[in-house]
Amino acid sequence: MDYKQTLLMPKTAFPMRGNLPNKEPERQKKWEETNQYAKTLERTKGRPLFVLHDGPPYANGDIHIGHALNKVLKDFIVRYKSMTGYHAPYIPGWDTHGLPIETALTKKKKIKRKEMDIAAFRKLCEEYALGQINNQREQFKQLGVRGDWDNPYITLTKDYEASQIKVFGDMARKGYIYKGLKPVYWSPSSESALAEAEIEYQDKRSPSIYVAFEVKGGQALLSGGEKFIIWTTTPWTLPANLGISLHADLTYIVVQVGEEKYIIAEALFDDVSESLGWENPQVLQSFKGKEAEGIEAQHPFYDRTSLVMLGEHVTTDAGTGCVHTAPGHGEDDFYVSRSYGIDAFCPVDEKGVFTQEAPGFEGLFYDEANKIITEKLDASGALLKLEFITHSYPHDWRTKKPTIFRATSQWFASIKDFRVDILEEIKQVNWYPHWGETRLYNMVRDREDWCISRQRAWGVPIPVFYGEDGTPIITDETINHVSELFREHGSNIWFEKEAKELLPEGFTSEHSPNGNFAKETDIMDVWFDSGSSHEGVLLNRQNHQRPANVYLEGSDQYRGWFNSSLSTSVAVTGKAPYKAVISHGFVLDGNGRKMSKSLGNVIVPSKVQKQLGSDILRLWVSSVDYQADVRISDDILKQTSESYRKIRNTFRFLLANLADFNPNTDRVKEENMEEVDRYMVHRLQNVLAEAHKNYNQYEFAPVFQQIHHFCSVDLSSFYLDFAKDILYIEAKDHPRRRSIQTGYYEVLTSLVKLIAPIIPHTAEEVWEYIPEPEAESVHLTDIPEARDVAINEQTVDKWNHFMKIRDDVLKALEEARSEKVIGKSLEAKISIAAKDEGTKKVLDEMEHLHQYFIVSEAVIVDTLTDAKEGNVVNVQVEVHPGETCDRCWVSSETVGENKNHPSLCSRCADVVTKHYAD
């Protein structure tokens, strides 16, 4: 007889290799064809609502690895919530206005914007943005991200723009919107104002100069001829200098150096003296800053004076304590000058070029003027020192070019008027990680008013009209009318119609007695676009609510979307738009470096999908501490693939050993299951409990680690291993075999549901092979909660202790193998002596020890002399004296007892005789 035919070997069509790059697209197509997203919503209808609100990526270019990290993290949460008692819709969004799209058209597509009608150019921008959305949508779907991809929210749609106008109007009605002249971040490369959120800092090489301003009219304090020393890294702002700021309470000194007398802050005497190389400087006089208020000094190259003013912004951190003040080029400069009745003066145009107001420098780009201005200072004797420094300097985050401060007339949101409310709301939000609260709190506490106007074409128009006297007109009537116009026609109508045609019929204003009106030509900051999504999406879309349960974005969004959304929401509703905020770090290469084409270290999501599969990328996301910066490389993905193989092979083994198991007819009642099976089901409950806790705290790495550890240690190394001797060898319906299969079935169905949010393609594939599944898709089921198992605490403790015994035994077997005492563990007979009473009690209560240790015989003895010493037992390993059974490979002294089956042990002979007699 061929005894192989009598073994119940594992059988499954579930493939060992995932072949994910080929299979995932097919599965995604099936999900789309069966409309699984709609089925998920239908199944969970009536449950509590859970809304993760998508921060909209910018609709330009292919998605990068940071996008993949972001969208996959969101998908973990939404999928998990829909499998744990919630109704969790997911509406993806896109941010579509702004300079990058204008640039893409003018540079890449060679469109000449200034030769076109604005409305026509805007239509090209819209077409481009929608094309980019279609491209990114497919790339996100390829990651396995589930959502309402056919109905995303897009910031250029009519309904969205209409709701944004409402937000603007609500803020204006409360007095939070105003127009004012003051210095703002200005990007000459974009020819537009920028908000703080659009600034990034990069190193820049700049001239560092010390300049002398000679006193003219020192009042009673100074005799005349003394020189204030200022320090600056922006010589190009000196043509706009109108003053010198001192701190009222600082002590200033007059220092004699050769024939010259210089004025600096006393606290900076040593630093300045060293920097300027002074020899034998003598302090002649000291006075408080407030005593010098009103003194005038001669401008170093123009025939005008600069006023000495007092400002709180003056410090002794660097410089001289005498601060060059150009009210058109600095915020502190602007405010301190205004308090002295000095208006902003800005002789630089929108391109960063000097105007006629800066004689001698007209037509020069500001940065090019540094050299000429420095030479002019040197020629006049006002330049005391020139050197070059590299420092962190604000750049336009889109063009990567330096920005300047430039005083212009702009529209602002008056953050100061509701700052206290924002700060209070920040405290009500749950922050992951916790430091996010402090980070945003400090940003809001320190930020100035928000410049919301941009001098560009592609964006939502600022819905303001001007009367004949120049007064801005914003009323509920005009706002509601414009909002409805945008809802019906889109915002392009603003550029297609005259002001009169955009106003309500019969509209009149005291500011336009003749009925003539003009319209604003600036557009809104794109952060106002996305920052209004709480109104356009959370309030207005079905199955949504404001506040959302969670916002999740990169840590750069504390200054961006988290901030703008919070500002507009608190302004309009008094409340934060979110209950919780989660931030993730940036994706770096394997060495912790930023990715760049020049370094050749860029990991592209689509390439990973084609080479390894999206589930590998998703498993990597689940394995990292995403709240800090994370690393990815080919080697790291290779390690992730190994982890994936371990999990996949565990599922395959479980499926293969359930081929002849029907849960409806073969399941063993829990109280009748073998103790070891109940213990393993209990261990499963621990995994479920911990995983639920971590999922709910948005901690995914521990979930991955728990599942991987359970598969590797609890299952592969123990439960799946020892059970082969029962599953393959015993009769099909043997109680112990069915008990193990009952345990396997619960482990399999629970684990595949638990990991489904992380690797949805693989989980679905496993589900298709599970006998008698409860639903058509694993994603249309609920993850089980941890439950009580029919096993008492003492029994659990016993098995926990047994695992320590097993560790000692396995170590002894391994040593015996390396010493060539045995080959395979089934050749062994082991003797075990407990080192304490507790261990002895556990051993005495155990049955089937030889199977749990995968040896041919295990004997418990009181003492051992020649043994391997372990932590809780001593173990002696020797070759078993019996013969090896041809069927089960166990060495037994009963081999040969059955004359019909002389090569079998008594157990196998009995099984074959009873069940395979024919």
Curated annotation (Swiss-Prot):
- What is the predominant subcellular site recorded for this chain? cytoplasm
Listed binding positions for L-isoleucyl-5'-AMP are 553
Question: Which keywords are on file for this protein?
Answer: Aminoacyl-tRNA synthetase, ATP-binding, Cytoplasm, Ligase, Metal-binding, Nucleotide-binding, Protein biosynthesis, Zinc
Tell me where in or outside the cell this protein is found.
Cytoplasm
Q: Where does ATP bind?
A: 597
InterPro entries documented for this protein:
aa-tRNA-synth_I_CS, aa-tRNA-synth_Ia, Anticodon_Ile_BEm, Ile-tRNA-ligase, Ile-tRNA-ligase_type1, Ile-tRNA_ligase, M/V/L/I-tRNA-synth_anticd-bd, Rossmann-like_a/b/a_fold
According to UniProt, the reaction catalysed is: tRNA(Ile) + L-isoleucine + ATP = L-isoleucyl-tRNA(Ile) + AMP + diphosphate
Query: Which molecular function terms from Gene Ontology are attached?
Result: aminoacyl-tRNA deacylase activity; ATP binding; isoleucine-tRNA ligase activity; tRNA binding; zinc ion binding
What top-level branch of life does the organism fall under?
Answer: Bacteria
Task: Please report a single Pfam family linked to this protein.
Answer: tRNA-synt_1
Give, as one word, the top-level EC class: ligase
Residues annotated as binding Zn(2+): 885, 888, 905, 908
User: Required cofactors, per record?
Assistant: Zn(2+)
What does the note accompanying the cofactor annotation read? Answer: Binds 1 zinc ion per subunit.
Task: List the ranges annotated as motif 'KMSKS' region.
Answer: 594-598
The record's annotation in SUPFAM superfamilies points to: Anticodon-binding domain of a subclass of class I aminoacyl-tRNA synthetases (SSF47323), Nucleotidylyl transferase (SSF52374), ValRS/IleRS/LeuRS editing domain (SSF50677)
Give the EC number(s) listed in the UniProt record: 6.1.1.5
Subunit details for this protein? Answer: Monomer.
Q: What is known of its domains?
A: IleRS has two distinct active sites: one for aminoacylation and one for editing. The misactivated valine is translocated from the active site to the editing site, which sterically excludes the correctly activated isoleucine. The single editing site contains two valyl binding pockets, one specific for each substrate (Val-AMP or Val-tRNA(Ile)).
Q: What does this protein do?
A: Catalyzes the attachment of isoleucine to tRNA(Ile). As IleRS can inadvertently accommodate and process structurally similar amino acids such as valine, to avoid such errors it has two additional distinct tRNA(Ile)-dependent editing activities. One activity is designated as 'pretransfer' editing and involves the hydrolysis of activated Val-AMP. The other activity is designated 'posttransfer' editing and involves deacylation of mischarged Val-tRNA(Ile).
By what name is this protein known? Answer: Isoleucine--tRNA ligase 1
Q: Which organism is it from?
A: Oceanobacillus iheyensis (strain DSM 14371 / CIP 107618 / JCM 11309 / KCTC 3954 / HTE831)
Q: Which gene encodes it?
A: ileS1
